[in-house]
Design a protein with these regions (language model features):
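A short, basic N-terminal segment
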Residues: 37, 46-92
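Hydrophobic anchor at the beta1->P-loop junction of P-loop NTPases
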Residues: 98
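Conserved lysine of the Walker
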Residues: 106
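Short glycine-rich substrate-engagement loop in P-loop NTPases that contacts/grips substrate
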Residues: 128-157
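Sensor-1/coupling segment of RecA-like P-loop NTPase cores
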Residues: 186-207
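Accessory nucleic acid-recognition modules appended to NTPase machines
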Residues: 277, 283-424
Length: 424
């Protein structure tokens, strides 16, 4: 193995070397010096090249390369970047908690933001915790513990300032880390972002303590229709097209075509990638099917009894599908409707509270939302949770594609889902 570049940080100090196109810290190389042909360790413990190497800046070489690789695999330009930049520029910003359902691109967008706007990025995934971030928490969250963590993770030396960002992913996996957010905020000066897929469960779990006054929030969704049009270079057309029929027919046809595709496949990034690559709706549904199976498998882990799992499966698999076919004349409360539907599809004796538990989980997971009704348009007379909607048009289209639903009902439900999510 051969080192090709010496890497300097923003202060001019050596941060490490590029070996076989990969960055390695000086500490890591010292422990593995015998494996690098053109580097030696002096008596003073300094790494020296046998022949002078060209120097590169850490941020320029490492971060820009990482950013470029992410953009190559995830080229969509998302609106959440504006929210993240607004948070960063706020001089009094707090710890940011980025919320949203599974597979919408939260981690990807955070990485884009971090590698583009910071010199040092510390990325922690609590589902694996490969380098024992929990030790940082147990030992006081101080800068020395972060330096030790960075060495374990083969990252550059910890720089405790606003040029460093700490991203803690899947934070719902550890109540200890979540409960230490305030301590982290008070102990270090770098920017901190936490995120996860099922953060709603934290609200109802006694193990998690809400760090009031320490967190600000941002919420991310699947791609909106405007973001979807951006993928196909039609966002400007969407913004400027004449709403009174005075534009060219070609422009209306182009937008209508994108709209019809969006109603079918929705806004999950991986689904849109598949459509861009293949143009095949059925292949897109294959991705949605896998997303839903993953969600169901992960959701079952949060129900403690077999009975709860069966009720959840019925609420998810049967009742919610049938809700897509609910007639406009049916004006029961969502829970009343679901309870009736679940009772008809299971041998269990089910009560409204048990169904409410399953629905609450679906809402926390970002799969389902409920909408209130202003009776006769009177904002003083609100009927709570009158109707439920899925968070993505593609999910509705996929589920209804597998059921015997009238085309008129199907079109109406998907259109309502589109409008609800655009307004929401």
């Amino acid at each position: 193995m051969v080192a090709t570049y010496k890497v300097k940080d923003s202060t001019g100090k050596t941060a490490g070397f590029i070996i076989n196109d990969t960055f390695y810290t000086d500490d890591y190389i010292k422990n593995n010096i015998n494996y690098v042909d053109n580097l030696v360790l002096t008596e003073n413990g300094v790494i020296k090249a046998t022949k002078e190497l060209p120097e590169v800046d850490y941020r320029t070489y490492v971060n820009e390369k990482e950013y470029s690789n992410i953009i190559k695999d995830n080229p969509f330009v998302r609106d959440i970047q504006n929210d993240l930049m607004k948070w960063k520029k706020d001089p009094s910003h707090k710890v940011l908690q980025l919320e949203g359902s599974r597979q919408i691109g939260k981690t990807t967008e955070l990485k884009k933001f971090a590698y583009k706007n910071y010199e040092y990025v510390i990325m922690v995934d609590l589902t694996a915790d490969t380098y024992n971030f929990i030790d940082v928490i147990n030992n006081g969250c101080n800068p020395i513990e972060f330096e030790k963590y960075c060495r374990r993770a083969s990252l550059p030396h910890f720089v405790d300032n606003s040029n460093t960002i700490l991203i803690i992913d899947e934070i719902q996996s550890s109540s200890m880390v979540y409960n230490s957010i305030r301590k982290l905020h008070d102990s270090i000066k770098c920017d901190i972002v936490v995120t996860g897929s099922y953060l709603g469960r934290i609200l109802g779990d006694k193990k998690f303590f809400h760090p009031a006054g320490t967190i600000s929030y941002a919420h991310m969704f699947t791609l909106s229709f405007a973001e979807f049009c951006r993928v196909f270079q039609c966002e400007e057309l969407l913004k400027t097209i004449n709403l009174y029929g005075e534009d060219t027919e070609a422009n209306y046809v182009k937008l209508e075509g994108l709209y019809n595709i969006y109603l079918k496949i929705g806004g999950y990034p991986e689904v849109i990638k598949k459509y861009v690559k293949t143009g095949d709706i059925n292949e897109c549904y294959g991705i949605i099917d896998k997303l839903l199976e993953t969600f169901k498998d992960e959701s079952r882990a949060y129900f403690h009894e077999a009975r709860e799992v069966e009720i959840f499966d019925n609420v998810y698999r049967e009742a919610l599908k049938q809700m897509c076919n609910r007639e406009d004349s049916d004006r029961k409360n969502v829970l009343e409707t679901l309870t009736t539907l679940v009772k008809n599809n299971t041998k269990l004796i089910v009560n409204k509270g048990e169904v409410a538990n399953a629905v609450t989980w679906l809402k926390y997971a970002g799969i389902l939302s409920t909408c209130n009704l202003a009776v006769d348009g009177d904002m003083r007379n609100i009927s709570e949770s009158r109707k439920a909607y899925f968070s993505d048009c593609g999910i509705v289209s996929y589920l209804t594609d597998k059921s015997l639903i009238k085309q008129s009902s199907l079109t109406g439900m998907i259109t309502e889902t589109f409008v609800y999510n655009e307004l929401h």
